[in-house]
A protein has these predicted regions:
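Short, conserved alpha-helical segments within structured domains
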Residues: 26-30, 48, 75, 120
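Acyl-donor (CoA/ACP) binding surface of acyl/acetyltransferases
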Residues: 1-20, 53-121
């Protein structure tokens, strides 16, 4: 994820359906801060949320990665993702989450990762 991904990530993070678990949808300033926070996570932790790109075109359709979250009173690693609405339910989040899982187990000391998601009929 870089500043060059702003326009693509704005389409994702400003969507109220995608951001329903956040206090608000992101405006332009919040998206810029989101990008900068992830760049800082790369520096501090060596990981964060990465841009999810289509293999065929390179188009950014969201983000997915590993972040440290306060869960049940403890800081724990969690896989998180946001995928553009028109690309949802096509396996991109699953593929990205599996890649993050594999990367995490091969490159960090973590042996447990959390992932929260909704199950649809």
């Amino acid at each position: 994820m870089t500043e060059d991904d702003f326009s693509a990530l704005y389409k994702v993070l400003s969507d109220s359906d995608i951001m329903k678990y956040y206090p608000c949808v992101f405006d332009e300033n919040r998206v810029r801060n989101w990008i900068f926070r992830n760049i800082e996570r790369y520096r501090v932790f060596g990981f964060g949320l990465w841009a999810v790109c289509l293999k065929e075109t390179g188009d950014v359709i969201g983000d997915c990665g590993l972040t440290m979250q306060l869960i049940d009173g403890e800081i724990k690693p969690e896989i998180g993702y946001h995928i553009r609405a028109d690309k949802q339910r096509k396996g991109y989040a699953k593929e990205a989450a599996i890649a993050v899982r594999d990367w995490t187990f091969n490159n960090t000391p973590f042996n447990v990762i959390l992932l929260l998601y909704e199950i649809y009929k």
